Structures are given as C-alpha cells and as structure tokens.
Design a protein with these regions (language model features):
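Short, solvent-exposed coil/turn segments at beta-strand boundaries
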Residues: 49-52, 74-83, 98-103, 176-183, ...
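Flexible, processing/modification-adjacent segments and terminal tails
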Residues: 27, 31-32, 48-49, 102-166, ...
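Gly/Pro-enriched, hydrophobic low-complexity segments
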Residues: 148-217
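N-terminal leader/targeting segments and the immediate start of mature chains
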Residues: 2, 17-72, 76-77, 81, ...
Length: 217
C-alpha cells in the first residue's frame, strides 16, 4: 500500500510542471521556487498519510438567493465515517449527522428523548469533508497545484474534480498554509466557476484517535 501511494505521489510530481500553467487563475500562480515545491511535496505527503481528523469549521452554502452559514464540529475518517454537529446558528444548533460508512443518521442532541432518522447521503453534505476532497484528489485524472499570496502568508492550493456531474459541485480547491501544513479553507465551485460552498477551518487536528461510538447512534 505504501509503495502504491508513493507511486501515485511520484506521478503527480512528474506532471506538476505541466499543470500549474493552467491553474493560476483567480489570483493564483505556479510555485516559484524550491521552497514552494518542497511545501507542496510535504502537503501531498500529509494528504496521503491522513487517516482521521477533527476540526472546528464554518460552512457557508451560497446560492443566487443568498447564503446560509453554519458553525460546525467535524470528525472524519478517510474510510468514509464522519460526524458533523452544528453549533450555530441557534435555530440549527445541536443538529448531528453521523455516518458509519453504511447508514447515515440525523438527530438533535439538545432534544430530550431524541429521535434518530435514517437519511440519504447528499453531495452537498459529503463534499464538505476534507476526506472527500482527498479521495477525489487521488482519483482525479487531472489535478493541479497553485500558490496563493495572502496577507496571512503563502498558501498552496490543490484542485480536484468532483465526480457525478452535479450542476453546482464541479471543482474543489483546498488552501493549505505552507508553514503549519494545516488546511485553511476548502471551496467548492460550480461549472461556471462560482463559489457554492466555502469551508473555513479554525481548528484542525490530524490523525487523532476517534472512537467508533462517534459515528453510531
């Protein structure tokens, strides 16, 4: 398995110089020096080694009618299990969605005698997890890497296609801090390049121990 991961990583690195030229729109540019290439390699290695994460993140859904913003706590495994709890706004606070990889349940942990509902998966929910981005990145026929110069520092930007031909979820971009190696934000674009979902990470922890009970009722 490790050999396969390294082979995939090597293949992506070999094509890096070919794809950066077409991924520099929207204030992005290609890696300019050895330090930025090294940061990219470290970030890629981090992605391939990620097994679990815990995060506090703001999730914003945008449409032609406006936007809806939620504060969330996320737990996820690369194997597909996840848990997301909404902590704000107050009207949605306490809402929890869990997936054990087979079934998805929703409940509100602020309601006494809570009732759990089995629900269908939706890409609007599943694609907000970093683990989904990593899986798409590994499986994409074409991926790209760019660099963004921001007031807070230099960010490496990874891009991957989202499978399924969803009209509003076409491309995902992940901004990662070159110094901390922590994800800063994940943005999902529609086919016209409009931002549809923006996930902003406030606290992010890699490869934490997650109890199986987090993903079950």
């Amino acid at each position: 398995m490790k050999t396969k991961k390294l082979a995939i990583l090597a293949a992506i690195l070999m094509t890096l110089t070919l794809i950066t030229a077409c991924s520099t729109g929207g204030g992005l540019r290609g890696p300019a020096d050895a330090a930025e290439i090294t940061a990219f390699e470290r970030i890629q290695r981090m992605m391939f080694e990620l097994q679990t994460y815990r995060a506090i993140a703001t999730v914003e859904y945008r449409s032609n009618k406006g936007s809806n913003v939620y504060e969330t706590v996320q737990h996820a495994r690369i194997t597909g299990e996840y848990r997301i709890e909404v902590t704000a706004p107050e009207a949605a606070a306490g809402s929890v969605t869990t997936s054990d990889g087979r079934q998805i349940h929703q409940f509100n942990n602020r309601v006494n005698g809570r009732v759990s509902l089995i629900v269908q998966e939706t890409p609007e929910r599943s694609e907000i997890f970093l683990t989904s981005f990593i899986r798409n990145y590994k499986q994409s026929e074409e991926v790209s890497v760019s660099v963004a110069d921001m007031d807070e520092g230099v960010r490496t930007v990874l891009e991957a296609s989202i499978p399924g031909n969803h009209p509003y979820l076409s491309i995902a971009r992940l901004w990662v801090d070159n110094e901390t190696m922590l994800p800063v934000k994940l943005v999902i674009f529609d086919a016209d390049g409009a931002e549809r979902i923006v996930v902003t990470y406030h606290i992010f922890e890699y490869n934490v121990v997650l109890d199986d009970g987090l993903f079950t009722i």
